[in-house]
Structures are given as structure tokens and as C-alpha cells.
Amino acid sequence: MIRYKGFILFLLLMLIGCEQREELISNLSQRQANEIISVLERHNITARKVDGGKQGISVQVEKGTFASAVDLMRMYDLPNPERVDISQMFPTDSLVSSPRAEKARLYSAIEQRLEQSLVSIGGVISAKIHVSYDLEEKNISSKPMHISVIAIYDSPKESELLVSNIKRFLKNTFSDVKYENISVILTPKEEYVYTNVQPVKEVKSEFLTNEVIYLFLGMAVLVVILLVWAFKTGWFKRNKI
């Protein structure tokens, strides 16, 4: 009898402590999911990964912190795109395209690689890079290259040093670009205010709310356990039922 009471108490505690979670984002790689969870936990939001197999990994959070988690993902521009591999942009078995199209694809890949590299600089949260490349034929005089950068940063005290580091990095990346043709616009990260709100209840019908469903499930489990206990202990026979 004591054993069954302990088991019943354990099930009740599990039902009471069952947290309502909501899927924040899905179809992620392991790296993307880890980056999101790292940012959320640094801001006191509990999150967990769920492996969906071929559908990738999803991240779940408590319903009360869902809105704050969405704000953090927007502020940190998450999830970060997968690492760009230049060889994947030009597979050996692909159809031969025009030189202009090949050049455009190459510069697009370079822009993405540079964006990923700039995030490695301290204080840079995310970055977007645009390169004005010349698509004209070689016999036509080429125009000077310009590079524009929009970066979200996290260290307002070092903004001037950050601009200098970004420009120096890009100048050493492209030998043909002039220092004065590199423009960098810094945008400070938004101030984050944690809010733990009550989840919005989705009423499926007048009687079919989540609380009612959990209550009926708990009662059903208890009834089954009590019936099993009654049959095993002979309670029905002793009471002539």
C-alpha cells in the first residue's frame, strides 16, 4: 500500500510540475541551436533543445518567457546563417554560367564570409556588408570599389576603435579598395528589458482548455492505479463488490 501511495504521489508531482513550453524556432543546426540557447541563458531564460531528426533541432522555452526570447533573437540577429563554403557555391557538376554570373556569385559568397568574420571582432553582434563590384568586361575601364558596412555593436565606449578595426580589416582584405571608400555605420544594440508574462491561453472550446485536459489525465491515471491496487490486494472480494 505504501508503495502505491508513493507512486501516486510521484505521478501527481510530475503533473503539477509539468511546465508548459512553446517552440521558439525549429529546423536548426547544432551550432545554431547552441548559439541561441547561450544567448537566452545569459539573459536568465531557460531553454532546451529538441532533436527532430531530419527536420533539424528546435529550441523550446517556457510560455511566460516566449516574448522576451523572440526579442533577444531579433536583437542578436539569430539564428546566424550557416558558414559559407566557396566550393559549395561553385560545385564541379553545375552548369556553366556566364562570367558575369560567376563573378556575382563569388562576390556574394565573399560578402557572407566577411560578415561572419566581422562577428569575431569584439563588440560586434552582427554585420551586413555590401561590396560594389564591377561586372563590366575587362576592356572597359573599371570603377573604383566601394564597401559599406552596417554593424550592430555592444560596446558604445569603443565605437571609434571599432570603426577603425573594421576598416583596417576590410582594407587588408581587398587590395584594390581605398580606405576612404569604406564606410561603416554602427548601430547600438537595443536595451533589453526582461519580462516574464503569463502565457496567452488558447481556448480550444468552452471546456477543452489545457488545465481541464491535465486534470482529466491525472484523474484517469489515479483511477487506473487504484483499480490495479484494488484487484491485487483483494479489496473488491473483502467488500463483496
From Swiss-Prot:
GO terms of biological process kind: protein secretion
Cellular localisation: Cell outer membrane
InterPro entries: AMP-bd_C_sf (IPR045851), FliF_N_dom (IPR006182), T3SS_SctJ (IPR003282), YscJ/FliF (IPR043427)
Lipid attachment, kind N-palmitoyl cysteine: C18
Membrane topology value: Lipid-anchor
Chief location: membrane
Segment forming the signal sequence: 1-17
Lipidated sites in chain (S-diacylglycerol cysteine): C18
Pfam families: YscJ_FliF
GO cellular component: cell outer membrane
Keywords: Cell outer membrane, Lipoprotein, Membrane, Palmitate, Plasmid, Protein transport, Signal, Transport, Virulence
Domain of life: Bacteria
PROSITE patterns referenced in this protein's UniProt entry, alphabetically: PROKAR_LIPOPROTEIN
Role, per record: Involved in the secretion of the Ipa antigens.
Family: Belongs to the YscJ lipoprotein family.
Name this polypeptide is given: Lipoprotein MxiJ
Organism: Shigella flexneri
